[in-house]
Amino acid sequence: VGLFRARTEATTPLEGIDAVFADLDGVVYAGAGSIPHAVESLNRTKRERAVGYITNNASRSDASVAQHLAELGLDVVPGDVVTSPQAAMRLLEERVEPGALVFVVGGEGIVTELEKRGYRVTRSADEGPAAVVQGFAPEVGWRELAEASFALNAHGGPDSTEAGIPWIATNMDWTIPVARGIAPGNGTLVSAVHTAVGRFPVVAGKPETPIFEEAKRRFGVERPLVVGDRLDTDILGANRAGMASAVVLTGIDRAKQVLAADAASRPDFILDDLRGLHEPYPVVETARDGAVRVGKARVRVDGRRVVIVSDGDGGLDLLRAACAAIWQSGTKIHALDVPASLYS
């Protein structure tokens, strides 16, 4: 995985693909506005194949997300949105029958999905819930985390031989971007409960596979392309699920992170923005001297040095060539002397 799929001529990343599963923040929008070229590129994609939106956000329902996307100009309905609470429901149904009482940490996104499937919702451990589903909401505080711990420890605490009731987390994002900066995410809150109960939850969201499997099942497709801005969730998750992946450099991870990506987190395609979905993607070629060529750019790893043989147009093809050369070398990037120009 990672730029090494067999390709002998330049075709678009959508060649042979029957659906696109796009992340939201950093791919479709940033803050209140859409990212340049995202809306028109995704609407164009939808004219030819399925487009789904995969989000770890557990605080909003699919209808709420779809309304936001439609306001940005996207052709979208609630069924196009796959949320981590929806993926969590399938995990829950495998463990607890509908009609059971479920303790919830989180907001509208989780409660809506539970009620759709006939589960009853509680916020009290004293009511004897059959399972705990934990997701993020800005108002979640110590009281909710403590109550979840009491529910999980009621039948199977740290010193118990009992397995305890099922505990499902929508996602394990350690941080989330908000208007004022980076804030603790659901993974941080799950970790707090873990400290009190001595075990880990089953996780539904990226980079775990249930959310990708839910999307594939819903759209009835076989060869989706996952598009995301984070290597540690979008790309890692796509690779784990056996799906093609493209990282777009409009969000969290940029050139430096992509160059340093470990084998499990390497994308098949590197795009500046979503216009790249519809543009021919250059072939990656390796010359006899070991130099990797992408377009007019050529990069070689010489011992511990990364050498720019030709920077071509000095654009994205240079980054693509450098990634392929570094990844093929098998050497961790911290052990290499990398030209600073590759990071810009």
Roles of regions detected by a PLM:
Residues 49:
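Conserved phosphoryl-transfer catalytic core
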Residues 46:
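Conserved ATPase "switch" residues in P-loop NTPase domains
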Residues 84-86:
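Polytopic endomembrane small-metabolite transporters, centered on the Drug/Metabolite Transporter
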Residues 1-22, 29-32, 36-39, 43, ...:
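Asp-based, Mg2+/Mn2+-dependent phosphohydrolase catalytic module
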